[in-house]
Amino acid sequence: HNRGRLCMANRYRISDLDFVYISYMEPNKEENWADLKNKVPWAKRVDGVKGFDSAHKAAAETAETDFFISVDGDNIIDETFLLQTLDFEKTDRKAVHRWRAKNIINGLVYGNGGLVGWDKETCLGMHTHENAKDKKAEIDFCWTVKHENLHNCYSTSVINSEPFQAWIAGYREGVKMSLN
């Protein structure tokens, strides 16, 4: 399989890209990893890396393709995502590409927890969260790294497999919604 090499004038099949599963302490991470490997047998994994920036850099180092898809440890992908293409004539290849996810608790569909496409150089060159060089970058990628927000939903964010996981997710959402 020649993943990531098939380019039709800046169009890439999602199924030709590396997928990197990023897990840390999600209580459902092993179940979700098994689900991903069933759907995406070539998926790779980064587990237990402390810090958002560091974990994403580890994912970029693990990916063998120049552009890769990250899947959070609490995310379940929809197999139809593998049938999609990404057209870099319509988006900025160097930007972070974020697809929406369905929040399993409230049914809302939005960017948080969704699948993310990363240009390897962009990911390795960013300084966010624990490695941030300014206050805005400490909060989230979206404040300092260019984003392409894509409006299709290809996954479900399963953030309620244990009560504490649901509480953490809700707290994070509340804090982010209160920011300007």
Region locations from a protein language model:
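Short aromatic/hydrophobic "clamp" motif used to bind/position activated sugar donors
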Residues: 68
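Acidic donor-diphosphate engagement hotspot in glycosyltransferases and nucleotidyltransferases
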Residues: 80-82
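The conserved acidic donor/metal-binding loop of glycosyltransferases
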Residues: 72-76
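Flexible, glycine-rich phosphate/dinucleotide-binding loops
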Residues: 27-28, 77, 105, 124
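N-terminal anchoring/stem segment of glycosyltransferases
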Residues: 4-62
